[in-house]
């Protein structure tokens, strides 16, 4: 697993700072997808190293989705050396993560702990991509973000389960 959890946590802190509406784990995954896509298109590389897979409802982040599912399911780990334990702990060093029970599903809500968004860990180009995407989509619903994924030819033409980014 080659993903930068410190940068992910800081992007979530930035989303909280910018008061992204209805911010839950699904919206975070989609906003990160668009950040990665924007940066790849303009700079030729990803910011975080996350892989995105097409689903029937849009795209999901391979590692982040697994981590969020483990948190939602309140999984207890047998092996403390499991990378996922480290990744989840790193997120929780920056963020309070609360499981919210809805009528038909559960979702994760995030709030800031003591740390503020640290822009020094990003390059100026990475910051431009993050600012652009978050400002563009901060008021967009999860459903509309998912629909936006399908406006991309690469997503539309891929089979479910295929890597799209």
Model-derived regions, located:
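Domain-edge interaction signal
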Residues: 1-165
């Amino acid at each position: 697993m080659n993903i930068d959890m410190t940068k992910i946590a800081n992007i979530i802190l930035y989303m909280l700072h910018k008061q992204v509406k209805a911010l839950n784990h699904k919206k975070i995954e989609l906003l990160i997808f668009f950040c990665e896509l924007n940066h790849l298109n303009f700079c030729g590389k990803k910011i975080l190293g996350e892989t995105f897979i097409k689903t029937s409802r849009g795209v999901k982040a391979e590692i982040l989705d697994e981590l969020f599912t483990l948190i939602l399911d309140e999984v207890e780990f047998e092996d403390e050396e499991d990378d996922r334990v480290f990744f989840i702990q790193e997120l929780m060093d920056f963020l309070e993560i609360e499981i919210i029970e809805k009528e038909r599903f559960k979702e994760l809500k995030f709030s800031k702990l003591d740390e503020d968004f640290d822009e020094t860990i990003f390059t100026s180009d990475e910051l431009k991509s993050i600012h652009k995407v978050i400002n563009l989509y901060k008021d967009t619903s999860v459903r509309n973000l998912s629909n936006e994924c399908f406006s991309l030819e690469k997503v539309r033409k891929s089979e479910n389960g295929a890597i799209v980014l």
